[in-house]
């Protein structure tokens, strides 16, 4: 954001009260591995791409304006009171943030660790803890709301200010891990370190082209769009659920090592057994072998000794 700093998301019917922004579909550009849009309220161009474990953001701020970045550890795709069990954020230095967020919900105990690298140094930062009931012991002896390097809680929203007057572009690389912040840092270094946004976006484009080039089809433009969109969807889930060193969080919430296979999660088996998995057996047999091995590990880690019903982020949802 630019201008007045807001730490509430705002309502859909009144976006001016929060940090959300209006946008027009006319400024959107979307392709496998890439998304771009103009945030009209702030005049910020947002571009997104990804590697397997790292999301890369590029924000171009208006010339002559300081930039703000809001890190909301409360809100997600769907929200309700009590969803966030605990969250932590550390400012390791002026270009590296680490932390984690533990949530319940469909995945009853979902651990998400992160490491965030910034292309420009932080000028100043602060937090808001929106929890109504808080521990007010030793930690509250510090002024933790501004330039304090660590914050924990259930309803944490942080802000970071940057001097973007001279350099208007800010690249943010967000690496994820279900294991640890150390694992997230390893993922960041292995997949996105020392590479520009443009290089990473081009690599994502190449990877998706390699995936989608397995088929040649004849037909109308609409028919081809339907085919390749469906093919694209089959390559999203099940998804890889392990760090670059093979570490992953198992169904028993212990840390395991995937030896000789790639560990997967998100098995919506009630509807994928009919079409997607037979399809993957034909076009990606090596991937199917890894998925079967992942299901076997799920069974071995299950206190019920059951294969997955509906596996999500290393949790059994007992759904469908």
Predicted regions mapped to residue ranges:
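Beta-sandwich/jelly-roll carbohydrate-recognition scaffolds of carbohydrate-active enzymes
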Residues: 1-264, 297
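Aromatic-rich carbohydrate-recognition surfaces in CAZymes
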Residues: 265-320
């Amino acid at each position: 954001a630019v201008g007045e700093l807001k730490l509430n998301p705002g309502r859909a019917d009144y976006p001016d009260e929060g940090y959300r922004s209006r946008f027009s579909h006319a400024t959107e550009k979307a392709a496998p591995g890439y998304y771009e849009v103009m945030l009209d309220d702030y005049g910020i161009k947002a571009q997104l791409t990804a590697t397997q474990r790292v999301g890369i953001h590029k924000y171009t701020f208006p010339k002559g304006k300081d930039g703000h970045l809001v890190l909301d550890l409360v809100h997600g795709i769907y929200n309700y009171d009590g969803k966030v069990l605990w969250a932590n954020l550390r400012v390791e230095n002026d270009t590296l943030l680490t932390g984690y967020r533990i949530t319940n919900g469909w995945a009853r105990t979902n651990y998400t660790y992160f490491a965030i690298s910034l292309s420009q140094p932080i000028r100043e930062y602060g937090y808001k803890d929106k929890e109504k009931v808080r521990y007010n012991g030793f930690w509250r002896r510090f002024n933790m709301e501004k330039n304090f390097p660590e914050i924990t809680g259930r309803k944490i929203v942080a802000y970071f200010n940057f001097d973007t007057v001279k350099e208007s572009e800010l690249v943010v690389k967000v690496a994820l891990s279900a294991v640890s912040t150390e694992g997230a840092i390893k993922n960041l270094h292995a997949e996105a370190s020392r590479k520009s946004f443009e290089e990473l976006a081009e690599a994502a484009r190449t990877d998706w082209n390699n995936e989608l080039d397995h088929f040649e089809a004849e037909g109308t433009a609409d028919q081809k769009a339907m085919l390749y969109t469906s093919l694209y969807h089959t390559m999203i889930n099940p998804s890889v659920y392990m760090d670059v060193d093979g570490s992953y969080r198992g169904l028993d919430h212990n840390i395991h090592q995937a030896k000789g296979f790639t560990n997967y999660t998100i098995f919506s088996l009630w509807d994928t057994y009919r079409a997607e998995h037979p399809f993957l057996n034909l076009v990606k047999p090596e991937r199917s072998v890894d998925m079967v091995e992942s299901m076997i590990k799920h069974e071995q880690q299950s206190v019920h000794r059951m294969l997955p019903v509906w596996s999500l982020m290393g949790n059994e949802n007992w759904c469908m």
